[in-house]
């Protein structure tokens, strides 16, 4: 008798004769897609083809979507951390640190490994998987801590022969079973050398991950392909693909098996060729079967369009050859031009091989602050500066606010949005990546990177709010106090305003398109993850089918072993395809999606720069000129009056007013010239983003070809293995 009502036994995957008569409170009937052949026939279906049973609930067009959504939310909250043994929490942290991990959650590959190494039948594995992993929502991407707790509890119940229902889990809340899994044992053995000296100190959340790989997202997406075999085994491994990219070497590690034997995954056959001018290096083999490196942290390094140029000047703003573009916008040249120099709309850009600075941002697991006023901290690390500081999200907001006041006519990067009570793993990961893009765009900007506020933000080790109280901070407009050079205005091209309007129009349209592209690619990646989960369901269902094949064809069982071998081969290759799909979706999120978001942020920041120009670049020169004319007439009139008819000091007062107005006109005119020069320089900086577009398209196309080849190899291998299945001929 359950606290939430009786829960009749489920129709077994092959060994139970009870029939489910009603739904439990938690709507935890497993989807038959992952159950055995005998599961769907005993659910009280009135249809000949069982088209009103659990299969219907797995349809996205079904009216039971609300029921499935409620179950999905229930799995997350059924077993909070306070109700589970320490071994559950340790197991989750262990898998996050040593196993497959997607963002800040446990990936489906690790879920499959835990199930397959638990000694359960394929039917029980399929039932548990379908209970814990819903067909929609974030669980198709991986399991959070609450879902993982339910997974372990269900495995423990199955090993003890108990019912596999949420009611059964709730009944055992006070004394949850301790599951056994050889996969978790292997992870513990692997972690043993680096175990902490004080085992009694158990982290409730994953420890801060190490510094991230300092590569752009396109390079990180290629790293997930680096260990898929040698260059000779990959006909698509062009050395040109990796020219100019720095790949991080990782320590080799034995690959993690997936429970179905040696299955070819998306990260055991990629290759990496060095550039023509580089020495070819040995491909690292420390990637897991899902494409992740050891201890892959929940962090990423700066990347995207800013990280792919490799042409920043040596900290002198826009001076030197960078400014020799946009007509005659830059400093005077030597009078000689390269014959092959490209010029579009009068823009010419020279490049440099200087390596750009990269900043990593890690989300720290512990919250700080009083109850109801807690906040999360981020570890901001700069390898070039050798600094590591702790910052809050509000610190980033303060920095951007100061930069907007001081540099309103610069290409200021975008901050991810703030959301109240948003602690979901997906939102926190998106915000962290947005902070990575923001910080790296700052340090790669020729002017903003030299700003004292930015330097202090990245290097002051104390809490920023404390430093702000002690420091003298200036947020004056960058043009305040500057003297207009005599030749600057003449050096600007006459059609500069027309170029500004042309670029602004193109940027506005491009930004809208890239916003839509990011949304579409996120949707494609989610579909790939959902497709991977369904492939795993299909694989588990086929395995459970082999358990009843002998009984189904009991009249003559001679061909059953060969039949089961073919079915298991299909299950193995479906599992392999699931790994490939999951790896590809992850590569999209870390690679092409981040590249598109960098390009989107770049375009939106330029669009906002033009919007700020409309608001802040105004002047009142026409009004001042009219007032000067009026005061000059008044001054002439005063001077023509008799000496006693003029009040003392009135003439001096009018003269001072005229002088101040003329001085204001000169200052406002100079400021207008500075604004034009500033925006011109920003467009020269922005011009480099076109080359990032080329790289992201090249990288993504190569990635798609490689994964397509791997999928083709996988299904070709399956075709060979099922060739010998009995045909009754």
Curated annotation (Swiss-Prot):
InterPro entries: AH/BAR_dom_sf (IPR027267), PX_dom (IPR001683), PX_dom_sf (IPR036871), SNX8/Mvp1 (IPR028662), SNX8/Mvp1_PX (IPR035704), Snx8_BAR_dom (IPR045734). GO terms for molecular function: phosphatidylinositol-3-phosphate binding. GO terms for cellular component: cytosol; endosome; membrane. A 1,2-diacyl-sn-glycero-3-phospho-(1D-myo-inositol-3-phosphate) binds at residues 392, 394, 418, 431. It is found in: Cytoplasm; Membrane. Coiled coil: none annotated. The keyword DNA repair does not apply. GO terms for biological process: protein targeting to vacuole; retrograde transport, endosome to Golgi. The keyword Protein transport applies. It is a peripheral membrane protein. It holds the Pfam family Snx8_BAR_dom. Residues 1-43, 177-340 are annotated as: Disordered. Residues 356-464 form the PX domain. Keywords: Cytoplasm, Membrane, Protein transport, Transport. SMART domains: PX. The PX domain binds phosphatidylinositol 3-phosphate which is necessary for peripheral membrane localization. PANTHER family: SORTING NEXIN MVP1. Belongs to the sorting nexin family. Required for vacuolar protein sorting. This is Sorting nexin mvp1. It comes from Aspergillus fumigatus (strain ATCC MYA-4609 / CBS 101355 / FGSC A1100 / Af293) (Neosartorya fumigata). The gene is mvp1.
